[in-house]
From Swiss-Prot:
Cofactor binding annotation: Binds 1 lipoyl cofactor covalently.
N6-lipoyllysine modifications at: 63
Keyword Endoplasmic reticulum attributed: no
Occurrences of domain Lipoyl-binding (ranges): 22-104
NCBIfam families to which the protein is assigned, alphabetical: gcvH (TIGR00527), PRK01202.1 (NF002270)
GO CC entries: cytosol; glycine cleavage complex
Entry protein name: Glycine cleavage system H protein
PROSITE patterns: BIOTINYL_LIPOYL, LIPOYL
């Protein structure tokens, strides 16, 4: 299981990466492994507001339907539209090509409140 050091993580298994002043969001390798083959993803539209801890979309796999939760509050400024035609990208490359949305944060400090890689690794080990 891959847990990149440069990302921040949530207890709901989303990751967040700073990209300039924006935050890119996706689901972790652990999450995609638990889901199995992703067959559908529903994401918000550019311009939609998102609130930390609240649902911003849905991922459907052969095993389950899971909500996606925003790691920070802000406004969606970019959506990975190719995922609608190729949702399996989330399984193949969850941290790069499988990113989901980019958020312009209301408060950039929200990112610092998320778990670092070591804390997330410990959290996942408790879940297994």
């Amino acid at each position: 299981m891959e847990i990149p050091e440069d990302l921040r993580y949530t207890r709901e298994h989303e990751w967040a990466r700073r990209k300039g002043s924006a935050i890119v969001v996706g689901i972790t390798d652990f999450a995609q492994q638990q889901l199995g083959d992703v067959v559908y993803v529903e994401l918000p539209d550019v311009g939609d507001p998102v609130k930390k801890g609240e649902s911003f979309g849905v991922v459907e796999s052969t095993k389950a339907v899971s909500e996606l939760f925003a790691p920070i509050s802000g406004k969606v400024i970019e959506v990975n539209d190719p995922l609608s035609d190729a949702p399996e990208t989330i399984n193949e490359d969850p941290y790069e090509e499988g990113w989901m949305i980019t958020i312009e944060p209301s408060d950039p400090k929200d990112l610092e409140a998320l778990m670092d890689a070591a804390a997330y690794k410990a959290f996942v080990e408790e879940q297994e």
